[in-house]
């Protein structure tokens, strides 16, 4: 309560000094009586000086009657007393007599012997139970925790305040604070008590409106936005509203106005506080926009260099405005210039915006720590290396290293290297944050910094009792200032403020409109104001500490035991006060840090709080934070709730007037200012947990009622928690017991056993007898692509005649743990369970399309329900891989030998049909498991879907082949005719990657007539439906497919199929993209000795760019015979050009096989290839315009064919050098050096030879045999006439043309 205190002028102090001098003179030579009289006189003078005229008159009478011996002393005393009586005495109102008077008196005394800690504790216990703990743990000695909790809603009891400040804090606490260098020093005088700051809109007596806009009077957007941001800070608005009495005094008396604002006038003068209060009232009372005249008219007094009409910085104006308000408040005191800095930092503005940073500098040599404290009113955060506000805070409070040898250590007494780190010693009530967006040269950093409406700074609190004794540092966003513009010298300022209703509004000068929370958090903010949120954090420590105390005392659930426990706590108030009033342990509950009490006691608090709920209104916070404990982890849930509260419920605690969603009515009563009716018997536990509504006689009833309130409040707060946390509780009731515990914050795994998987029944007969195999050591592949045959072999572990089965047991087990199923799929499981899993798991993905199982690092999309379910798992071992490959190669060898014997009967339709049928029978017999109907799956290899035939009959009969072909035509993916597209850059031959491509190799070695006759039996292969799987094959230079060329009538119906080595079936050149010269058997030395070069190519083709059937998985040479390819290629050229007598030989060019020489195809091949070479050169000349746009792949630059295989075949060959590397020849001799061949330079003109055209890109690969020695024949001229439109499609199947011979180069240069 206000106390009138007499304050004497300077003359009073001078008179007292004269009296003291007179006393000293008399005592030196005076008698005992004189000393006694002097003592009484001194006392009388002091009393008269402080008491009044009546007391001094009485003392004068006594002194005159008894001072007969010392007349001189008497005269001096009388004269001094008269001066004191005549002196003018002014009275000043003080809020606290103890702090203003008694604390000043303490400085006049010297403590002879400091009390022991036990005596201090005893003195504290004899006083108030909460005094010592509150005073010690308060904010720097003047922030009383007990008073702050009560004063937020009203006034505390005078007895508590007087006892706290007089007894214990005046003796030992202040001395401890002043003597401890690691603690913030206590100010000698507090101008404005911190607990008087009213936090939140509900603490005010008035109803706060949204606020009117402010008119821009000329580049004053910075002023308008700053004022709007300040007026929407509840603490500042409440304080300005409480200055009504000062506002009236400034208007009435010029002296008061002069004292408040410097003597400027009768209407407020220069008092900027009055100007702010008037402007605030104008915004609240007017519905239309106002002019902030009281502020911009005093702009020169606020800041001397600011001019009206000029653009200014909003943060600079904010700092000058707050400083001017502080100065105006200090000028209310006559001796404000004599106040020290700590006292000046206790003004209302500093109590609202001010805080203290603790700076710790640690020497790296002697580990000496130097601690200093720094006052701040805003934090300037560097955002150059941050994208979020939390990252900026982490960078600000992180430990930084001082420059080497630049810090002088107090311990080492020398310059050493050190580290420096900031922490929050005392956090401000309103935190002002400025993002450093502007540089010294005026540039602006316009990056987006994301922030949350609620932040927690508890993790940055200093490790000191005072810092730990603060409230949990949870802040909510109340206002911010944004800047729109690209530089400091231009732009526009706007403000966003939080109103009492809990909604945000955008204030753009005179325009005021609501804004959504998402828009607020996405703004390009410049200055942000966060205010302490006392409602939400206060409930959390009370509940948690309540649980800790009950656990430590054995779970008291009865009224009598609680009363006994409360009496014990009242007898030992020091410990309880430390725990209850100091959230020393509770600050660690917010954020990632754990409480000092440990997790063991915390894990059992849920049951205690739910059954014996003594918290009345705040138990819902505990219920939410303890909710994740049901899943087994409590700590994650606490931090999770905090994060969800910041993200999903930013406005919790803002609608303070209603208060129903956040606090129960009992707690609301305390918030309105009602203190405990029985403070003596009510202990600290009841004070903190029940918030002043403790009635020990009604404990049981309160517990029952609060348990119901707890459930209701839990339901109200459930939407605040994150969605996955809610799902975890709901799914826990549905799903079976999971094998591994899952944290609430962890994302749910794919499948995750959410629901029972539904398997797709392929046939009416189901055999749910299989069981999921146990996975012990999953195998890892060295090659990231699946083999074509390994899945077929592993999936066809059952007999080939078995019907498709679905195993629901294995499906459910695999779906419940998809990660185990994925690992299990990589092992060689039993036959039946493997098939069951391959059918059930993909079907589970069909029902859950968002769950894609990853195989080899690629996500697989589920197939539609109409198609066979796709398996995405590798289910074979390396041994199965080798066996399947060997079987396929054996079947290929047998077929090749068969084809060599029948090569003279290629135009006989009946013979070709029989050969084809026999070949199919051999293939199906050797790889019967490949055609098994139990593998009705289309495996996905590295993101490329592959198809597989579906057959239900036995694979040992010929009907299997025909039915498989029919099914393949239906699904556009037959295992005997179509091949899947292999990966774009396969690391190994494509024939092994694809299970169907191998079949196509054996089938597609037939010539055109063979296919025409075969189409009569297998009509499905020429179905006009374009196969979707083969659509991507033309982009793959390593495809192992070889589609048989259909008849001319049906040639354009299906999409183009690739040959075995990557070329199109309609092109004469067979190769893997490497154009070669004609290697005719025994034909003028053009191909007889090409084995050396081809073998060299075959040895290096395992790098992924060579042929698709050169090397096996173990790196050995395959057993595949290469003769049929040469014959087929020669025949295809002859057939397409009208030469049906004999097939021409052709180098396959892709390193597929060894060229065999035959005397029957020499002349035809020479004539054909010469013509084709001429046509190819003409086409290349026409494509020179697209040279630079279609450069070849740099990864294949080093691969090029030579002119001939080795020097044996032709004298024109220039690669007879031993150790010749055909892969390096193109790079070293042809393109770059270009010295040995004397060819044109790299960038040649169109007049140069067109044979160099194909060296630049892969687009023009003509799959033709170029003239090796300039010789050739006739025929095949029309080969390219109807293929020109398709040649640009052959980029994926081509490589580089062969280097021309020396004769060709000379001829081309001459031409």
Swiss-Prot record:
Biased segments, Basic and acidic residues type: 880-889
Localisation per UniProt entry: Nucleus, Nucleolus
Ranges of biased composition (kind: Pro residues): 980-989
Catalysed reaction, written as an equation: Thiol-dependent hydrolysis of ester, thioester, amide, peptide and isopeptide bonds formed by the C-terminal Gly of ubiquitin (a 76-residue protein attached to proteins as an intracellular targeting signal)
Residues found modified as Phosphoserine: 581, 787, 789, 982, 988, 1047
Enzyme category, top tier: hydrolase
Residue stretches of biased makeup (Polar residues): 869-879, 1060-1081, 1246-1255
Ranges of Low complexity composition bias in the record: 120-134, 156-174, 560-572, 605-616, 660-716, 759-774, 795-826, 925-942, 950-979, 1037-1050, 1154-1176, 1204-1221
GO molecular function: cysteine-type deubiquitinase activity
Domain USP: 212-533
Active site per the UniProt annotation: 221 (nucleophile), 492 (proton acceptor)
Keyword set, alphabetical order: Hydrolase, Nucleus, Phosphoprotein, Protease, Thiol protease, Ubl conjugation pathway
Catalytic activity, EC: 3.4.19.12
Positions where Phosphothreonine occurs in the chain: 767, 985, 1050
UniProt cross-references to InterPro entries, sorted A to Z: Papain-like_cys_pep_sf, Peptidase_C19, Peptidase_C19_UCH, USP_CS, USP_dom
Name of protein: Ubiquitin carboxyl-terminal hydrolase 36
Organism: Drosophila willistoni
Origin organism lineage: Eukaryota, Metazoa, Ecdysozoa, Arthropoda, Hexapoda
């Amino acid at each position: 309560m206000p106390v009138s205190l007499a304050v004497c002028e300077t003359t009073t102090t001078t008179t007292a000094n004269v009296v003291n001098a007179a006393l000293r003179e008399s005592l030196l030579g005076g008698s005992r009586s004189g000393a006694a009289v002097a003592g009484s006189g001194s006392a009388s003078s002091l009393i008269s000086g402080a008491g009044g005229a009546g007391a001094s008159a009485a003392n004068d009478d006594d002194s005159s009657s008894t001072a007969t011996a010392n007349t001189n002393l008497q005269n001096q005393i009388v004269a001094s007393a008269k001066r004191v009586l005549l002196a003018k005495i002014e009275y000043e109102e003080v809020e606290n007599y103890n702090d203003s008077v008694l604390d000043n008196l303490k400085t006049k005394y010297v403590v002879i012997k400091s009390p022991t800690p036990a005596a201090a504790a005893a003195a504290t216990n004899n006083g108030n139970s909460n005094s010592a703990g509150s005073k010690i743990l308060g904010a720097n000695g003047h922030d009383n925790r007990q008073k702050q909790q009560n004063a937020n809603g009203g006034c505390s009891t005078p007895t508590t305040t007087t006892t706290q400040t007089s007894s214990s804090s005046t003796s030992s606490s202040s001395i401890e604070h002043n003597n401890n260098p690691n603690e913030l020093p206590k100010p000698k005088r507090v101008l404005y008590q911190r607990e008087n700051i009213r936090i939140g809109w509900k603490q005010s007596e008035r109803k706060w409106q949204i606020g009117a806009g402010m008119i821009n009077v000329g580049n004053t957007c910075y002023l308008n936005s700053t004022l709007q941001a300040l007026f929407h800070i509840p603490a500042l608005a409440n304080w300005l509203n409480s200055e009504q009495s000062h506002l009236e005094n400034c208007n009435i008396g010029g002296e008061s106005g002069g004292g408040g604002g410097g003597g400027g006038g009768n209407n407020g003068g220069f008092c900027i506080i009055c100007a702010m209060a008037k402007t605030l009232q104008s915004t609240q009372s007017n519905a239309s926009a106002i002019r902030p005249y009281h502020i911009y008219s005093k702009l020169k007094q606020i800041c001397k260099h600011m001019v009206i009409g000029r653009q200014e910085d909003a943060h600079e104006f904010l700092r000058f405005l707050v400083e001017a308000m502080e100065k105006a408040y200090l000028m209310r005191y006559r001796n404000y210039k004599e106040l020290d800095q700590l006292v000046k930092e206790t003004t209302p503005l500093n109590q609202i915006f001010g805080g203290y940073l603790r700076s710790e500098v640690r020497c790296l040599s002697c580990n000496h720590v130097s601690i200093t404290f720094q006052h701040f009113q805003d934090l300037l955060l560097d955002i150059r290396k941050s994208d979020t506000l939390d990252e900026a805070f982490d960078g600000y409070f992180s430990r930084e290293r001082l420059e080497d040898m630049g810090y002088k250590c107090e311990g080492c007494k020398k310059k050493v290297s050190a580290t420096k780190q900031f922490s929050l010693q005392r956090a401000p009530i309103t935190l002002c944050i400025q993002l450093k967006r502007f540089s010294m040269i005026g540039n602006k950093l316009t990056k987006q910094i994301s922030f949350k409406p609620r932040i927690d700074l508890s993790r940055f609190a200093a490790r000191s009792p005072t810092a730990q004794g603060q409230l949990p540092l949870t802040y909510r966003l109340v206002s911010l200032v944004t800047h729109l513009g690209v530089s400091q010298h231009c732009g526009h300022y706007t403000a966003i403020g939080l109103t009492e209703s809990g909604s945000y509004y955008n204030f753009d000068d005179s325009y005021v409109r609501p804004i959504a929370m998402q828009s607020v958090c996405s703004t390009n903010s410049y200055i942000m104001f966060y205010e302490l949120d006392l409602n939400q954090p206060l409930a959390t420590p009370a509940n948690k500490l309540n649980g800790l105390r009950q656990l430590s005392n054995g779970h008291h659930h009865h009224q009598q035991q609680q009363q006994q426990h409360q009496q014990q706590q009242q007898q030992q108030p020091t410990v309880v006060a430390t725990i209850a009033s100091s959230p020393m342990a509770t600050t660690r509950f917010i954020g990632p840090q754990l409480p000092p009490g440990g997790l063991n006691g915390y894990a059992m608090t849920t049951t205690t709080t739910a059954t014996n709920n003594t918290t009345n209104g705040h138990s819902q916070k505990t219920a939410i934070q303890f909710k994740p404990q049901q899943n087994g982890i409590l700590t994650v849930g606490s931090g999770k709730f905090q994060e969800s509260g910041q993200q999903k419920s930013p406005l919790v605690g803002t609608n303070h007037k209603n208060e129903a969603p956040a606090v129960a009515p009992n707690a609301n009563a305390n918030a309105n200012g009602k203190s405990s009716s029985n403070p003596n018997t009510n202990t600290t536990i009841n004070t903190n947990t029940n918030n002043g509504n403790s009635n020990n006689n009604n404990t049981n009833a309160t517990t029952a009622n609060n348990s119901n309130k707890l459930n209701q409040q839990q339901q109200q707060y459930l939407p605040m928690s994150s969605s996955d946390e809610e799902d975890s509780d709901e799914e826990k009731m549905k799903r079976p017991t999971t094998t591994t515990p899952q944290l609430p914050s962890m994302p749910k795994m794919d499948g995750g056993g959410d629901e029972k998987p539904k398997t797709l029944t392929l046939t009416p007969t189901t055999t749910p007898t299989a069981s999921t195999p146990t996975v012990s050591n999953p195998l890892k592949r060295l090659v990231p692509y699946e083999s074509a045959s390994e899945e077929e072999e592993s999936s066809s572990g059952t007999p080939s005649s078995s019907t498709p089965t679905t195993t629901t047991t294995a499906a459910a087990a695999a779906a419940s743990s998809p990660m185990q199923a994925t690992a299990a799929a990589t092992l060689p499981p039993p036959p039946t369970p493997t098939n069951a899993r391959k059918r059930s798991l993909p079907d589970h993905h069909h029902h859950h399309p968002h769950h894609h199982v990853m195989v080899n690092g690629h996500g697989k999309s589920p197939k539609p329900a109409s198609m066979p379910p796709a398996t995405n798992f590798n289910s074979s071992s390396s041994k199965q891989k080798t066996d399947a490959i060997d079987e396929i190669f054996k079947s290929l060898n047998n077929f090749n030998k068969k084809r060599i014997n029948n090569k003279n009967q290629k135009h006989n339709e009946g013979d070709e049909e029989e050969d084809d049928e026999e070949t199919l029978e051999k293939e199906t017999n050797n790889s019967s498991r490949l055609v098994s109907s139990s593998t009705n799956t289309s495996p996905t290899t590295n993101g490329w879907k592959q198809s597989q035939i579906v057959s239900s009959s036995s694979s040992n009969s010929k009907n299997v082949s025909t039915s498989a072909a029919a099914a393949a035509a239906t699904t556009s993916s037959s295992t005997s005719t179509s091949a899947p597209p292999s990966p774009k850059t396969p690391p190994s031959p494509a024939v092994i990657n694809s299970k169907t491509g191998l079949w196509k190799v054996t089938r597609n070695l037939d010539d055109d007539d063979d296919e025409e006759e075969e189409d009569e039996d297998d009509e499905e292969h020429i179905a006009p439906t374009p196969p979707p799987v083969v659509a991507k094959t033309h982009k793959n230079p390593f495809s192992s497919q070889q589609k048989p060329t259909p008849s001319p009538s049906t040639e354009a119906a299906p999409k183009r199929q690739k040959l075995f080595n990557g070329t199109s079936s309609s092109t004469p050149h067979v190769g893997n993209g490497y154009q070669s010269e004609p290697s005719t058997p025994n034909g003028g030395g053009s191909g007889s000795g090409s084995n050396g070069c081809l073998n060299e190519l075959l040895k290096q083709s395992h790098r992924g760019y060579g042929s698709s059937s050169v090397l096996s998985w173990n790196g050995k040479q395959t057993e595949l015979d290469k003769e049929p390819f040469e014959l087929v290629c020669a025949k295809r050229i002859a057939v397409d050009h009208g030469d049906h007598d004999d097939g021409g030989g052709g180098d396959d060019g892709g390193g597929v096989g060894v060229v065999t020489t035959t005397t029957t195809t020499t002349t035809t091949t020479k004539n054909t290839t010469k013509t084709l070479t001429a046509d190819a050169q003409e086409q290349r000349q026409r494509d020179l315009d697209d040279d630079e746009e279609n450069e070849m792949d740099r990864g294949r630059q080093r691969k090029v064919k030579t002119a001939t295989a080795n020097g044996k075949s032709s004298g024109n060959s220039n690669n007879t050098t031993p150790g010749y590397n055909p892969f390096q020849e193109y790079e070293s001799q042809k393109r770059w050096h270009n010295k040995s061949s004397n060819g044109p330079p790299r960038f040649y003109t169109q007049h140069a030879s067109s044979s160099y055209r194909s060296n630049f890109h892969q687009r023009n690969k003509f799959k033709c045999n170029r003239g090796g020695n300039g010789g050739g024949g006739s025929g095949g001229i029309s080969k390219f006439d109807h293929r020109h439109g398709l040649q640009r499609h052959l980029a994926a199947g081509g490589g580089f043309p062969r280097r021309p011979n020396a004769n060709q180069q000379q001829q081309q240069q001459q031409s």
